Amino acid sequence: MAGNNFGKLFRVTTFGESHGYALGGIIDGCPSGLKLNFEEINNELNRRKPGQSSIVTQRKESDEVIFLSGIFNGLTTGTPIGFIIKNKDHNSKDYFNLKEIYRPSHSDFTYYKKYGIRDYRGGGRSSARETVSRVVAGAIAKQLLKIYNIFIKAYVSSIGNLNFSENYNKLDLSKIENTPIRCPDIKLSEKMIYYINNIRKKGDTIGGIITCNIKNVPIGIGEPVFDKLHAELGKAMLSINAVKVFEYGSGFVGTKIKGSNHNDIFTNNETTKTNFSGGIQGGLSNGMDIYFNVGFKPVATIMNKQKSIDINFFKNQILVKGRHDPCVLPRAVPIVEAMSALVLYDNMLNNRVYKI
C-alpha cells in the first residue's frame, strides 16, 4: 500500500490499524536539539482521543504515546523519531457481522476491490483511528513552529445548520476549549451539543465545518506552480477522514464579489487593508493571517438499518454495532491543527535553501 507518507523534508510515515496491536509513526527530518514538551504532546492527544464527552464515541483509549527512537534526555537527536500508541479498547466482535457486507459510504467496497482483502474490524487502516499518529507528529511540528512565533488555532464554526458568521478576528479563541464542542461561541456551543445528542439518540450522524487560523507566517513560504501553499494545505485537509470540502480565503463568497472590491489593497507597512486572499498570493504566504474552512460529511456509520450488498452482490440489510461518533468535528479540531503544522513546518524547512 502506497500513500502512507506525508511531507518532503519534515516527513511523516504512519502505520497500524484500528483494531491492531498498535498504531504509530516515524518522523524523519526533525532537527536536533529541540527540547520536547511531552505534556503538550499528551494534551494534543487528549483533545483527539475517544470517550472525552457524551457527544463522541465512547471507546476508551488512553492514547499514551511510547517513543522508540530519535529522542535522548528529552532532546531530539536529528535521527528518525519512532513512536507507537497501543490499542487497548477495541471490540472486534462488534464487526463480525460486517465481514462480507459493505457498509454504505465507507471504504469497505473500494478497499476490497483494490486489494482483494480488507480488515473489516473497525475499518482497519481506513479508520480515523489512524489520525492519532498525525496528532503526535503535528504536536512536535507545532513546538517547532512556536520557535518562529507561528500559532495555529482551529475551532468548530458549524454543525449541521447551526453556524455563526463572525470573523475569527472578532472571536475570543481562548474559549475554544471551554466546551466539548470546541466552538468559541458558548451559547451556540450549547445548541450544538443539544443538537448532536438528539441526532445520536435517533441513531444518526451529522457533519459540519472547522475553521482554522494561522498567525505570524513569514512572507514567501510555499512553492510556486504545483506546490502552492494553499494546494499543500488543501491536500493535507482532504486527506483527513470524512473531509469533503477545503475553502480558503474568501472561498465561494469571493466568486460573487467584483474585483474592485475583492482586491487586497496594500498599506505602507506591507500588510493589506483586507484579507480576501487568505494570507496567500501566488501560492506563497504574504504575511497576513492564513485562514480556511474544512467541511466534514456526516459520519457514514449510523446505528439504524440500511440496505446494502455483500461481496457476492446479494442484497442485504446491515445494522452496525459498536461505539461510533455521532459527529467527528469536536475530535477533528486537533487533527486539522496537526496537518496544518506539518505543512507549515515542512515548507519552512524548504524555504531555507533560497537565500544565503
Swiss-Prot record:
Cofactor note: Reduced FMN (FMNH(2)).
GO cellular component: cytosol
Similarity comment: Belongs to the chorismate synthase family.
Keyword presence, Flavoprotein: yes
Alphabetical UniProt keywords: Amino-acid biosynthesis, Aromatic amino acid biosynthesis, FAD, Flavoprotein, FMN, Lyase, NADP
Root EC class: lyase
Source taxon at top rank: Bacteria
EC number: 4.2.3.5
Sites where the protein binds NADP(+): 48
Chain's gene name: aroC
Catalysed reaction, written as an equation: 5-O-(1-carboxyvinyl)-3-phosphoshikimate = chorismate + phosphate
Functional note: This reaction introduces a second double bond into the aromatic ring system.
The UniProt record lists the keyword Lyase: yes
Family annotation (Gene3D superfamilies): Chorismate synthase AroC
Protein name in the entry: Chorismate synthase
CDD domains documented for this protein: Chorismate_synthase (cd07304)
Binding-site residues for FMN, renumbered to this chain: 125-127, 241-242, 282, 297-301, 323
Assembly mode: Homotetramer.
Named cofactor requirement(s): FMNH2
InterPro entries: Chorismate_synth (IPR000453), Chorismate_synth_AroC_sf (IPR035904), Chorismate_synthase_CS (IPR020541)
Single Gene Ontology BP annotation: amino acid biosynthetic process
PANTHER family xrefs: CHORISMATE SYNTHASE
